[in-house]
Amino acid sequence: LADPSSVSIVMPAMNEAASVGGVVARLRADAAWREILVIDDGSSDETAARAEAAGATVIRHPYNKGNGAAVKSGIRRAAGEFVLVMDADGQHPPEDARRIVVRLGEYDLVVGARAAATQATAARGAGNALLNGLASYLTGRPIPD
């Protein structure tokens, strides 16, 4: 069982001004995390300002480098013993972060999966299914999302 104070939350964000402040505020209200890092991946809106106003530490990319680069920037900067990566658009309920944290320390990797219902396009769904299958094969465990 990991304590939330040992967890850095890494949140890549690109033009998420409409949601990032609320997501950060809900995370902060739910637990005393080590830190919440929002990686502003070249946004042209108020993403960084709203994340900072809600209490996050913001790492800025001067231009869009992509989600993978944003996640890497956040993980490299994270000071917590554990790192939880979460989207800034609110598709994952922030309160679910604590449900994942209770498994940290028991396992080397904890993966949270979204519900089967999704708004993704058919092409994106097929791509996700392929990557999920590969991840499941490589880990020897079912990874549904």
Regions flagged by a language model, labelled:
Residues 16-19, 43, 93:
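Donor nucleotide-sugar binding loop of glycosyltransferases
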Residues 40-48, 90:
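A conserved acidic beta->alpha catalytic loop
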Residues 33-37, 48-77:
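Conserved donor nucleotide-binding strand/loop of the catalytic core
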Residues 15-29:
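Short, well-formed alpha-helical segments that are part of the catalytic scaffolds
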Residues 9, 13, 39-41, 61:
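Conserved sequence signature across two-component system core domains
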Residues 63-77, 82, 91-145:
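Acceptor/aglycone-binding surface of glycosyltransferases and processive sugar-polymer synthases
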Residues 6-8, 35:
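Cell-envelope/extracellular polymer assembly enzymes that use nucleotide-activated donors
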